């Protein structure tokens, strides 16, 4: 699948993948701080942003999407970063194609299995009747009973597009809803990436715990875990400067 991406900057290639319900736009503020040091590739994963929709949606096909992008751009090896779902994609890519990853950064996700925990968000998104929707404000009001956190609603509504025909989701909501269990799947047992790896966690997030370290080291023996103070799961939005600082320090 030919993914949508935005390329900018000069220097060694750095490819960044967003998380579930997100898009490459989520990384613009980080990208501004990095364009003088790296050739950046901000990527929309399948069924997200402006990339194509598909009924097939799992880490196996998302890894191959990424490989196809690197092949098309003539990139033999890259710095690779992914957040949340994107973190799972880049971990799977690194253990499958280790020779193509110079250094790996994983944003607030561990290699383990995560139980489904987006049911209420999906319930709210699926409850919106886009054919009757008059405004983004109305969409926000209708989502509020399901998702009380304004910041999360604003993040989700970035994926609500509008054209002459009305509102439409950029995400492939039916497929994501049907296959949501794919997002939480663990890395396969015995898979290893021995290259330099940085796990960046949010200090206020529960996605990476102390007891994940053993599993992280088993798959990524050359890994470091850094916890960003005053950051939750969306650490790049909450503490962008701290994230940039740690990325620069690690990548060089």
Predicted ranges, named:
Residues 61-78:
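Conserved acidic catalytic loop of the alpha/beta-hydrolase fold
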Residues 1-15, 35-38, 75-76, 178-181, ...:
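Alpha/beta-hydrolase fold catalytic core
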Residues 82, 86, 90:
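Gly/Ala-rich beta-loop-alpha elbow adjacent to hydrolase catalytic centers
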Residues 116, 131-187:
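Conserved alpha/beta-hydrolase catalytic His-Asp/Glu region
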Residues 92-96, 102-133:
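Flexible "cap/lid" loop of the alpha/beta hydrolase fold
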Residues 4-52:
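Conserved HGGG/HGGXW glycine-rich cap/lid loop of the alpha/beta-hydrolase fold
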Residues 223-252:
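Catalytic active-site module of serine/aspartate enzymes centered on a nucleophile-bearing elbow/loop
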Residues 165-219, 227:
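Conserved serine/cysteine hydrolase catalytic core
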